[in-house]
């Protein structure tokens, strides 16, 4: 074998897995911090019970922090509903979406476990688990979560779409989360994020009506993705391109172009880079097959 071929392939594999691991860790960390701070704001301290405004502001700030931390690394999903919306809109591949959701659920569980560990016993019993309040029926609860998540995902797409804005999306997405909490707390405690509901439920073992906080948000996310990507701001992807993105055989899988105004010379230099060695071609083919490239 020609000297240097496999060394270049090794570097390519290392770079690939570094990028993948960074994105997954960003989703894990962002979701964990979101759950720790957000759910921490709803704990029933006897000295002073949290107000709806306090909870909404805390979730606002937690969201903005999570987004700012991860948006240039993973796209700042931190929410299985957002990831599903991106999948439906043909912005990420199925393998990447599955990996993101796994990282988000793990991060949410870790964040809830940390919160549980640092909270006194009498206060951590329910750990902010989402439940239905004020005689709200299960059907009404699903509908509320659907609408709340729909507005959130629409805001996520609009805030992170490079065709619309180049600014950081953290503040606007945080505001959308706060809006949902100002209304949704009275109905369901406001989830809009299956991972937020999943983490605390796992730690305290309370899964009553837990399905609501998957069905409602995921349905709302799908509807929001269809509205944004096919009605409000449709793109020009063909069916073949969408299928290629779904299975991960193309790199065109982002709605967000973090640096859409790169110099033309940089683009040209990237376009002229060729992988000529057998090892490099094999690694590139492997990464496309996984849909993680």
UniProtKB/Swiss-Prot annotation:
It is found in: Cytoplasmic vesicle membrane. Keywords: Cytoplasmic vesicle, Glycoprotein, Membrane, Repeat, Transmembrane, Transmembrane helix, Transport. The chain crosses the membrane at residues 23-43, 52-70, 97-118, 139-159, 166-185, 211-231. GO terms for biological process: carbon dioxide transport; nitrate transmembrane transport; odontogenesis; renal water transport; water transport. Coiled coil: none annotated. A motif (NPA 2) lies at residues 193-195. InterPro entries: Aquaporin-like (IPR023271), Aquaporin_6 (IPR023254), Aquaporin_transptr (IPR034294), MIP (IPR000425), MIP_CS (IPR022357). GO terms for molecular function: ammonium channel activity; carbon dioxide transmembrane transporter activity; monoatomic anion channel activity; pH-gated chloride channel activity; water channel activity. Aquaporins form homotetrameric transmembrane channels, with each monomer independently mediating water transport across the plasma membrane along its osmotic gradient. Unlike classical aquaporins, AQP6 is an intracellular channel with selective anion permeability, particularly for nitrate, and exhibits very low water permeability. It may also facilitate the transport of gases, such as CO2 and NH4(+), as demonstrated in vitro. This is Aquaporin-6. It comes from Mus musculus (Mouse).
């Amino acid at each position: 074998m020609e000297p240097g071929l496999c060394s270049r392939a090794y570097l390519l594999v290392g770079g690939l897995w570094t990028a993948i691991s960074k994105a997954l860790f960003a989703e894990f960390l962002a979701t964990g911090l979101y759950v720790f701070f957000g759910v921490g704001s709803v704990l029933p301290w006897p000295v002073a019970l949290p107000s709806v405004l306090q909870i909404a502001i805390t979730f606002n700030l937690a969201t903005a922090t999570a987004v700012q931390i991860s948006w240039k690394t993973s796209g700042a999903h931190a929410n299985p509903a957002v990831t599903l919306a991106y999948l439906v809109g043909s912005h990420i591949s199925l393998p990447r979406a599955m990996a993101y959701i796994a990282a988000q659920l793990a991060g949410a569980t870790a964040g809830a476990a940390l919160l549980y560990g640092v909270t006194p016993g009498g206060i951590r019993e329910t750990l902010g688990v989402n439940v239905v309040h004020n005689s709200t029926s299960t059907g009404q609860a699903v509908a509320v979560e659907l609408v709340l998540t729909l507005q959130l995902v629409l805001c996520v797409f609009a805030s992170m779409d490079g065709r619309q804005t180049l600014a950081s999306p953290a503040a606007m997405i945080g505001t959308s989360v706060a809006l949902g909490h100002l209304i949704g707390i009275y109905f369901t405690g406001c989830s809009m994020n299956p991972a937020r509901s999943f983490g605390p439920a796992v730690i305290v073992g309370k899964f009553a009506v837990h399905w609501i906080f998957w069905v409602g948000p995921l349905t709302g996310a799908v509807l929001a993705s269809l509205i944004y990507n096919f009605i409000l701001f449709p793109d020009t992807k063909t069916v073949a391109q969408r299928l290629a993105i779904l299975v991960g055989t193309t790199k065109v899988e982002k709605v967000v172009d973090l640096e859409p105004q790169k110099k033309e010379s940089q683009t040209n230099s990237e376009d002229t880079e060729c992988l000529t060695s057998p090892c490099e071609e094999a690694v590139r083919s492997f990464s496309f097959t996984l849909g993680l490239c």
